[in-house]
């Protein structure tokens, strides 16, 4: 019997049943109808959607129809900055950049240094804020321009958020947040108040533009509890409901359902050097057989293999990915060769990303929302 999985904004444990999780949260499956509507306006479908990394949503169809009527909307996502960024963190951001480019809309990106300070007993506030600035480099490195990307570091850019957060907080009862997030009598009040701030950004574009400006939030599905609450109270506060687009977690190199910051070998970080990347991929769990002879005779299982999972992330060519899949299943492709192919793809991506990341180092303040509003 499979271990029962646990998914909260702060913890993912066990092998996640994504269909069951979607049903538990009450989200909707991403169907061909929504994908076709997206393609109608974007002109194409991003591989992350085409290959099923994004699989559930709330009102994606509604915000696309809103777009079709020529009405304004925005994108919103965020990051809890507690350490360096790994590839799994970047999946929603890559789609975020694509959506911004295709639809020409602004992006609001929240760095929740306060949340990470509240959540981690060992975390100093200054450390969380330092990581917010460091992680911002990874977002900027994706190619955003200051007119399209608005960074919000909670402890530094609170002024435009706080009036909205106050209204949100007044609508949320202790019983509601306790039931939604599993808070207990020992939960500190910072963490109890924090959902008001994450919800507030969903309403911020409407305040700044002075007219209804709903947001679409691409993020991992563990963030759904925040935005369920946001949708519950939005209209009573005079704001449009936020729409969401949910991704699965990126499989850990060790074979678990999700990469873990507590195990550096489970993930590839954007600051890893080539030697480290090579070692991590070489040591990665695979769906291969114990010996090359067995692999050739019986074939491998790419469906449980993080190496194949990463090929799906980093290879934009559907025919190439399909060839890897069938070559593994047939035994024609051995794990060592497959890992070497993946290493070359990731090495190239990380090298280019690191160069862009360093160029962004003295530009963070130009992207911060508060610097544009002052």
UniProtKB/Swiss-Prot annotation:
Annotated SUPFAM superfamilies: Nucleotidylyl transferase (SSF52374)
This protein's UniProt keywords: Aminoacyl-tRNA synthetase, ATP-binding, Cytoplasm, Ligase, Nucleotide-binding, Protein biosynthesis
Locations listed in the record: Cytoplasm
NCBIfam families found in the cross-reference section: PRK12285.1-4 (NF008927), trpS (TIGR00233)
Molecular function per GO: ATP binding; tryptophan-tRNA ligase activity
Cysteines paired by S-S bonds: none
EC number annotated for this UniProt entry: 6.1.1.2
Segments carrying motif 'HIGH' region: 81-89
Gene behind the chain: trpS
Cellular compartments per GO CC: cytoplasm
Coiled-coil stretches: none
Superkingdom of source: Archaea
Catalytic activity: tRNA(Trp) + L-tryptophan + ATP = L-tryptophyl-tRNA(Trp) + AMP + diphosphate + H(+)
Family: Belongs to the class-I aminoacyl-tRNA synthetase family.
InterPro entries according to UniProt: aa-tRNA-synth_I_CS (IPR001412), aa-tRNA-synth_Ic (IPR002305), Rossmann-like_a/b/a_fold (IPR014729), Trp-tRNA-ligase (IPR002306), Tryptophan-tRNA-ligase_arc (IPR020653)
Residues spanned by motif 'KMSKS' region: 258-262
Chief location bin: cytoplasm
GO biological-process terms attached to the record: tryptophanyl-tRNA aminoacylation
Taxonomic placement: Archaea, Thermoproteota, Thermoprotei, Thermoproteales, Thermoproteaceae
UniProt xrefs under Pfam families: tRNA-synt_1b
Protein known as: Tryptophan--tRNA ligase
């Amino acid at each position: 019997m499979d271990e029962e999985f646990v998914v909260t904004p702060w913890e993912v444990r066990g092998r996640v049943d994504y269909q069951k999780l979607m049903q538990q949260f009450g989200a909707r499956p991403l169907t061909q109808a929504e994908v076709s509507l997206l393609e109608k306006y974007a002109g194409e479908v991003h591989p992350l959607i085409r290959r099923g990394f994004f699989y559930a949503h709330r009102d994606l169809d509604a915000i696309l129809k809103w777009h079709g009527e020529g009405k304004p909307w925005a994108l919103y996502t965020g990051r809890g900055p507690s350490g360096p960024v790994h590839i799994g963190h970047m999946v929603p951001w890559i789609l975020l950049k694509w959506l911004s480019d295709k639809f020409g809309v602004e992006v609001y990106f929240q760095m929740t240094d306060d949340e990470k300070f509240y959540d981690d007993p060992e975390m100093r506030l200054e450390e969380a804020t330092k990581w917010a600035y460091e992680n911002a480099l990874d977002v900027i490195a994706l190619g955003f321009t200051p007119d399209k990307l608005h960074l919000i570091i909670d402890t530094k850019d609170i002024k435009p958020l706080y009036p909205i957060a106050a209204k949100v907080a007044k609508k949320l009862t202790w019983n509601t947040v306790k039931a939604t997030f599993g808070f207990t009598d020992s939960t500190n009040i910072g963490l109890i108040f924090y959902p008001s701030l994450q919800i507030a950004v969903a309403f911020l574009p409407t305040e700044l533009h002075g007219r209804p400006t709903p947001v679409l939030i691409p993020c991992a599905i563990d963030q759904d509890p925040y935005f369920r609450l946001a949708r519950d109270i939005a209209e009573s506060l005079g704001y449009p409901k936020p729409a969401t687009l949910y991704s699965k977690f990126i499989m850990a190199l060790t074979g678990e359902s999700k990469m873990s910051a507590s195990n550096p070998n489970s993930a590839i970080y954007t600051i890893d050097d080539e030697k480290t990347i090579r070692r991590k991929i070489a040591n990665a769990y695979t769906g291969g057989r114990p010996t090359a002879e067995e692999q050739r005779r019986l074939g491998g299982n790419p469906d449980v293999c993080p190496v194949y999972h990463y090929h799906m992330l980093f290879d934009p060519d559907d025919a190439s990915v399909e060839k890897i899949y069938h070559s593994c299943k047939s035994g024609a492709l051995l794990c060592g060769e497959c890992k070497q192919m993946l290493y070359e793809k990731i090495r190239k991506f990380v090298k280019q990303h690191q160069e862009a990341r360093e160029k962004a180092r003295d530009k963070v303040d130009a992207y911060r929302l508060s610097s544009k509003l002052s």
